[in-house]
Amino acid sequence: MVRVARSVNARKKRRSILAAAKGYRGQRSRLYRKAKEQVLRSLVYAYRDRRKRKSNFRKLWIIRINAAARMEGVTYNRFLQGLKLANIELDRRSLAHLAVHNPDTFSALVGVAKDSLKNAPDPVAAARLRGTSSRT
C-alpha cells in the first residue's frame, strides 16, 4: 500500500495561517497553534464589526444632525418631526453631510422644519377634541 504524504498540504495550510497572523504580537505571529486561534478570533471580530459599522455610522450622523440643529435652536427630534410634517424625505446620511459641508442649506431646512411645526395642529389638543387620550 502506498503511503499518503500530507506534508505539502499541511505546510501550505500552516504557511497561510502564519501569513494571516503577520503583524500580531508575540507568539501569535510565530507559533502555529496560537496564530490559528488568533486568526479565527480575528475573523469573528471582522464579521461582527462589519455589521457594527453600520450602527456606528448611524449614531455619528444623528450626533452631527443634533449638534447642527441645536445651533439653530431646535432639537434633533423636533427637527425630524418638522421635516416629516413638511414632507421632506432626506435620510440621516444626507442630513449629516449637509450639516457639516453646507451649513446654509441645513439652516434653510431647519427653517422649513420650524415653519411646519408652527403650522401643524397640536396632537394633544386634537385628541382632547375627539374625547380620546393621545397617551395609552
From Swiss-Prot:
PANTHER family: 39S RIBOSOMAL PROTEIN L20
BP GO annotations: ribosomal large subunit assembly; translation
GO MF entry, a single one: structural constituent of ribosome
Protein name as annotated: Large ribosomal subunit protein bL20
Provenance organism: Tropheryma whipplei (strain Twist) (Whipple's bacillus)
Function: Binds directly to 23S ribosomal RNA and is necessary for the in vitro assembly process of the 50S ribosomal subunit. It is not involved in the protein synthesizing functions of that subunit.
One GO cellular component term noted in the UniProt record for this chain: ribosome
Keywords: Ribonucleoprotein, Ribosomal protein, RNA-binding, rRNA-binding
Organism domain of life: Bacteria
Family listed: Belongs to the bacterial ribosomal protein bL20 family.
InterPro entries recorded: Ribosomal_bL20 (IPR005813), RIBOSOMAL_L20_CS (IPR049946), Ribosomal_protein_bL20_C (IPR035566)
Classification via SUPFAM superfamilies: Ribosomal protein L20 (SSF74731)
